[in-house]
Amino acid sequence: MDDKKNAPSSDKSKALAAALAQIEKQFGKGSVMRMEDGAVVEEVQVVSTGSLGLDIALGVGGLPRGRVVEIYGPESSGKTTLTLQTIAEMQKLGGTCAFIDAEHALDVTYAQKLGINLSDLLISQPDTGEQALEICDALVRSGGVDLIVIDSVAALTPRAEIEGDMGDSLPGLQARLMSQALRKLTGSINRTNTLVIFINQIRMKIGVMFGNPETTTGGNALKFYASVRLDIRRTGSIKSGDEVIGNETKVKVVKNKIAPPFKEAHFDILYGEGTSREGEILDLGSDAKIVEKSGAWYSYNGERIGQGKDNARNYLKERPDLAREIENKVRVSLGVPELGAIKSDEPVAKKASAKESKEAKELKEVE
């Protein structure tokens, strides 16, 4: 009786082995493998967003490499600031970054203030949506770029629309362009471990009586292909006397394929400075009992670092090593990976290089 039960499973194993052999013969070794055989299961590599609270809300300590990310929100909510800070963080790790400025509105002086090394930043200002996405595809396939930002999806105007008359109706053209581009891009993005961030704008659906009337431009393809979607909103103003010096900002993780979604982060964006990272370190550090707060005084390891939040923030800004030490302790206490301080001349290690070295080793063994 047992032999009869085992016979079908034995036949299935033989059929599977034959199918795998055929696939490897046709498409090459490693086209299909068991999860435990190769380096398929890897820890997700991330890059910080420049906001400690948002890194923690993302669940893995930052934005994932080898994935598509969408950041959307109303005008002047901090979308471009967030991506520029991410570029600065990637450059600190020794990565190469590119900014595809479809809106033709990048403020180079502001980018420099946020810590971006302009001499290492690739920038493109394409004429059409097709040109922008072709440039993105070429950069991703090269394997030499670690982070690409496209600002924004709404500005990716199809060539037919630019060449046509002002009143021409061309329904679905941009959506088809995005759908085709993302089908081509996703495979090479994962293979080369490149992080691609799309900035998007919000539009209103006409005639919606119930539910949220807001939607993003460029159709539904980006919603599906994005591993992380961030909704960024301005919730208030920061004032110094009567002068407005920044925005209070809320970011909601609307979609997250690598950690639980729907978490929120609240932080301040100061004009000309970006996210108040040191302020977040003090707030989250005192919540985690890593930074002691007694009255108006902030202390760390028994040593006073400032009276009042502004003084303590300036103290940490002047001592980035101490700020990084406190931040990493906060990250560990909240179960998020620490930030590395390594910077090399070469781009951050690629998945492809590890795969190539493994294939070379196997080839050597065969020879």
From Swiss-Prot:
It is found in: Cytoplasm. Belongs to the RecA family. Residues 345-367 are annotated as: Disordered. Can catalyze the hydrolysis of ATP in the presence of single-stranded DNA, the ATP-dependent uptake of single-stranded DNA by duplex DNA, and the ATP-dependent hybridization of homologous single-stranded DNAs. It interacts with LexA causing its activation and leading to its autocatalytic cleavage. One of its GO terms (cellular component) is cytosol. It comes from the Bacteria. The gene is recA. Coiled coil: none annotated. It holds the Pfam family RecA_C. One of its GO terms (molecular function) is ATP hydrolysis activity. ATP binds at G73, P74, E75, S76, S77, G78, K79, T80. PROSITE patterns: RECA_1 (PS00321), RECA_2 (PS50162), RECA_3 (PS50163). Gene3D superfamilies: P-loop containing nucleotide triphosphate hydrolases. The lineage of its organism: Bacteria, Pseudomonadati, Pseudomonadota, Betaproteobacteria, Burkholderiales. Keywords: ATP-binding, Cytoplasm, DNA damage, DNA recombination, DNA repair, DNA-binding, Nucleotide-binding, SOS response. GO terms for biological process: DNA recombination; DNA repair; SOS response. NCBIfam families: tigrfam_recA. InterPro entries: AAA+_ATPase, DNA_recomb/repair_RecA, DNA_recomb/repair_RecA_CS, P-loop_NTPase, RecA-like_C, RecA-like_N, RecA_ATP-bd, RecA_C_sf. This is Protein RecA.
